[in-house]
Design a protein with these regions (language model features):
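Non-catalytic, usually N-terminal nucleic-acid engagement modules in DNA/RNA processing proteins
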Residues: 1-39
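Catalytic cores of enzyme domains
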Residues: 26-229
Length: 229
């Protein structure tokens, strides 16, 4: 039978968003802990979702937990790739669109995590409201905004998009600064990079997702509603 993908959106809490509004160079500690714990939480949700479908007699698999999931890198210049994109799956599922900062802008904003499950269960299909991959982003729809560019301490964003290398290097800077401070709280996260298992302690950054028009909503939708009024 045909396959379905169940895409799930988990927004960060208002407490984390409020604490992160004023962060300038290092993320709020409550965000970094939340970002770190989110990996294990999402993994548990995915395992239980897969188990639910399998007990109903259907096949199911979480892309992130597949043995073939990995991060690939290319040298000179360094480039990063993933063999599975949760954001592209969420777009295909009709949950939102992409943005200038390459986050995913959903009905509850861009400050989210987005895991998914593949199954042959006959799930109802949710239609996309737009086939435009950037329909929810103010910059791409109006040519204005760029608040995420202003918020990025790594200078990794511009009107040309997202420089993944600058972003990655700044994440490493954050890890060096924050890991000793939060070491008693952090959980290790394992993933495969270029075929080799790698252990890290994800702490996040996400300055581009906090204190911006798309943090918790679709700003384009709000603008359109204001225009109708």
């Amino acid at each position: 039978g045909s396959l379905r993908v169940l895409s799930i959106i988990f927004p960060y809490t208002n407490r984390i968003r409020e604490a992160s509004k004023t962060a300038k160079t290092m993320p709020a500690e409550v965000y970094s802990v939340g970002r770190n714990f989110a990996n294990e939480f999402m993994g548990d949700v995915l395992k239980k979702s897969v188990s639910f479908f399998q007990k109903k007699g259907y096949n199911a698999m979480a892309g992130m937990q597949s043995p073939v999931f990995q991060i690939l890198t290319k040298e000179e210049p360094l480039q990063l790739y993933s063999v599975w994109s949760e954001r592209h799956i969420a777009f295909a599922a009709g949950l939102g669109t992409f943005s200038l900062h390459e986050g995913f802008i959903s009905e509850v904003g861009c400050n989210i995590r987005v895991p998914s499950v593949i199954t042959d269960a006959p799930l109802e299909i949710s239609p996309r409201k737009s086939d435009d991959p950037y329909a929810n982003c103010l910059f791409y729809t109006t040519g204005k905004c760029k608040k995420c560019v202003e918020r990025c301490p790594a200078d990794a964003l511009s009107d040309k998009g997202h420089d993944k290398l600058k972003c990655y290097l700044y994440l490493k800077t954050i890890e060096q600064e924050m890991k000793p401070r939060l070491s008693g709280l952090l959980k290790p996260h394992q993933r495969v990079v270029n075929g080799e298992r790698n252990t890290s302690f994800p702490l996040g950054c996400a300055f581009c997702q906090f204190n911006v028009p798309c943090t918790s909503k679709i700003p384009v939708k709000e603008r359109d509603e204001d225009n109708r009024d």
